[in-house]
C-alpha cells in the first residue's frame, strides 16, 4: 500500500482537518463511528481508500492522521464532536498553554515540550503502514503553533523519515481577516525554516477563499466553516487520485515530479471549479469546457495573484466525475488558442491531466451544489511571487521599527534569525524572477563561434 499520514497543526490545521475528514468519510461511505457498510473485507484490504484509513479487526476505519495544538480548546471540539468516535484518542494531542501567535513559542519554548510525544504518535502510525509514501501537513502561516511548531516538526520529520515526501497545505494570512498583527513575522520565519524540508506546498489565501464564498456562493459574511468546507473540496480533489482508482493515478512523488522544476520553487497555485450554490447550479450546464476555462480565471484561484503577469512552469488538471479524455483535449485545445498562457521558454507547454471517475461529493446542508464534474488545476507559475512580495513588504514595515521583536527574543530567538529569514525570502523572490527570464540567446551564439 502507498499510505499517507495527515498531520494537522494548530487551529487552522485542525479545523481544516475536520472539514477534510468529514468529506473523506462521505466520499468513501464511512460512518462517523468508523464503520463502512460497503466494505466487505474485514481487516486491511487493498482498497485505495486504505491509503488514508487504517482498518481494525472489528472493521472500524481509523484516519491515518494526527491532530496537534498547543492549547486544548480547538481539539476538544473534535473530542466531543460528531466524529469523536472516528479518531483514536491518542491521535488528538494537546498542550496546556498556547503559542500566543508567537513563532518562537511554537518553535522553541512550548513546542519542544510536546514534539517528542507528537513524533512518537506519528511513529506509531508509520509503523502500521506497509509502504508509507509521505506526509500531508496542514497549518497556517500566521499562528504561533501553525508557524513555529510546524517548522520544528518538519525539521524533525526530515531527520526521522529522510526521503519521504512532505506536502504542505498552508493558510496564507489575509489582510481582511487578520487574527494577529505579527502574521508577517511568523509567515516569513516559518517559510524560511521549512523551505528546505518541504517538497511541495499548496498555499491557500484566506482572502481569496473569502471572495469566492462571497461572489460564487452569495454568503455575505463567510465563517471559517464556509471557508474550510471549500478548502476541504480542494484538498479532496488533490488527494482523490491517492484515494480512488482513476484513469491516471497520481502519487505524492508524481506531484513533485510534474510541478516542481527546482527544489525551492515548490509553491503551486491551486484553482478549483465549479464553486457554485445549489440554486445557481440548477440553471447551468457546467460542461468540461466551462469548468476548464474557469480554472484560468484569476477569480477562482486560492491565492490572489495574476498568472497573466507571470509565466507557467507546469500545469496539472485533475478532473473528477463524468469526464472523458476527448472533452478534456478539446477544452485544452480551445484554451491554448484563446487564452494568452505564457509558459517559460525552457518548458514544453504540456498540460498533465488526471481523471478520476468518482464524482465530487458535498457535505449535506453545506453551501456547495452537488455537481456531476469538477476540476482542480495545480499550476506552478512565477506569478505566485506576488504573494511573497506582499508578505515581505509587510514584514519590512514592522521590522524597520523592530516592532514586537522583543516578544520573540524573549522566548529564546535571536534577532539575527529575522534578518536571515528575510534574506532567504529575498532570495526566493529572486529565484522566481530568474526562472521567468528567458534563457539567454547569447550563449548559443558564442558556442557557434567555437566550433
Swiss-Prot record:
Question: Could you say which cofactors this protein requires?
Answer: Mg(2+)
Q: Which disease is it linked to?
A: Lissencephaly 3: A classic type lissencephaly associated with psychomotor retardation and seizures. Features include agyria or pachygyria or laminar heterotopia, severe intellectual disability, motor delay, variable presence of seizures, and abnormalities of corpus callosum, hippocampus, cerebellar vermis and brainstem.
List the source organism: Homo sapiens
Summarize the subunit comment. Dimer of alpha and beta chains. A typical microtubule is a hollow water-filled tube with an outer diameter of 25 nm and an inner diameter of 15 nM. Alpha-beta heterodimers associate head-to-tail to form protofilaments running lengthwise along the microtubule wall with the beta-tubulin subunit facing the microtubule plus end conferring a structural polarity. Microtubules usually have 13 protofilaments but different protofilament numbers can be found in some organisms and specialized cells. Component of sperm flagellar doublet microtubules.
- Chief location of this protein? cytoplasm
Classify the source by domain of life.
Eukaryota
Q: How is it modified after translation?
A: Some glutamate residues at the C-terminus are polyglutamylated, resulting in polyglutamate chains on the gamma-carboxyl group. Polyglutamylation plays a key role in microtubule severing by spastin (SPAST). SPAST preferentially recognizes and acts on microtubules decorated with short polyglutamate tails: severing activity by SPAST increases as the number of glutamates per tubulin rises from one to eight, but decreases beyond this glutamylation threshold. Glutamylation is also involved in cilia motility. Some glutamate residues at the C-terminus are monoglycylated but not polyglycylated due to the absence of functional TTLL10 in human. Monoglycylation is mainly limited to tubulin incorporated into cilia and flagella axonemes, which is required for their stability and maintenance. Flagella glycylation controls sperm motility. Both polyglutamylation and monoglycylation can coexist on the same protein on adjacent residues, and lowering glycylation levels increases polyglutamylation, and reciprocally.
The Enzyme Commission number assigned here is 3.6.5.-
**N6-acetyllysine PTM positions:** 40
Active site residues per record = 254
Positions contributing to Mg(2+) binding: 71
Q: In which tissues is it expressed?
A: Expressed at a high level in fetal brain.
Supply the alphabetized keyword list: Acetylation, Cell projection, Cilium, Cytoplasm, Cytoskeleton, Disease variant, Flagellum, GTP-binding, Hydrolase, Isopeptide bond, Lissencephaly, Magnesium, Metal-binding, Methylation, Microtubule, Nitration, Nucleotide-binding, Phosphoprotein
Q: Which gene encodes it?
A: TUBA1A
Top EC class, one word: hydrolase
> Residue numbers for the site described as Involved in polymerization?
451
Q: Which GO terms describe its cellular component?
A: axonemal microtubule; cilium; condensed chromosome; cytoplasm; cytoplasmic ribonucleoprotein granule; cytosol; extracellular exosome; microtubule
Q: Where is this region: Disordered?
A: 432-451
Q: Which residues carry this modification: 3'-nitrotyrosine?
A: 282, 451
What is the name of the protein in this document?
Tubulin alpha-1A chain
